Swiss-Prot record:
Protein name, UniProt field: Shadow of prion protein
Lipid attachment locations (GPI-anchor amidated serine): S125
Keyword check for Hydrolase: no
Localization of this protein: Cell membrane
Name of the encoding gene: sprn
Amino acid composition bias (Gly residues), ranges on this chain: 50-62
Taxonomic lineage from the root: Eukaryota, Metazoa, Chordata, Craniata, Vertebrata
Cellular component annotations (GO), alphabetically ordered: plasma membrane; side of membrane
Family: Belongs to the SPRN family.
Originating species: Gasterosteus aculeatus
Length: 155
């Protein structure tokens, strides 16, 4: 993996973590939202969302109130997922490229040796560890294959 891909992956990871940890909705308890208390009590305002009104006039206000708003966590998650898919596709492509070439040049073997660890991590049939430890191991190995192998031997 080139140094530029590592920088991009690091930036997206930091963006996702900061958006996830700093999201005010996630740290607020209950169903309160921005109005009312955080314990889920109903607001007394008639325009608060139509929780009590079951008639035809208030029927569509609850669902349409939240449409059109995009959370920073959703945006960051989508961006991080795109970056993860791109990095994973790069590793799978490198593995397939190495297997299709039979001339055995040193450059291709060296590139395959760096991606062989990721192939083993991505295959769930040979691993019995917890998914969290595998995720941590993959993240560490993405940024430094040397430390990833060390972490894999520890776990």
């Amino acid at each position: 993996m080139s140094g530029m891909n590592q920088v991009v992956a690091t930036c997206w990871t930091c963006l996702l973590l900061s958006a996830f940890l700093c999201e005010p909705v996630l740290s607020k308890g209950g169903r309160g939202g921005s109005r009312g208390s955080s314990r889920g009590s109903h607001s007394r305002s008639p325009k608060a969302g139509g929780y009590r009104g079951g008639g035809p006039h208030n029927g569509g206000t609850r669902g349409s109130r939240y449409r059109g708003r995009s959370s920073p966590v959703r945006v960051a998650s989508a961006a991080a997922a795109g970056a993860a898919v791109a990095l994973t596709a790069d590793k799978w492509y490198a593995s397939a490229y190495r297997r299709s070439k039979a001339d055995g040049s040193d450059e291709e073997l060296d590139y395959y040796n760096r991606t062989n660890y990721f192939d083993a991590q991505m295959s769930s049939s040979t691993q019995n560890g917890s998914s969290l430890s595998q995720l941590v191991s993959i993240i560490i190995a993405t940024f430094s294959p040397k430390y990833g192998l060390l972490m894999d031997s520890i776990l």
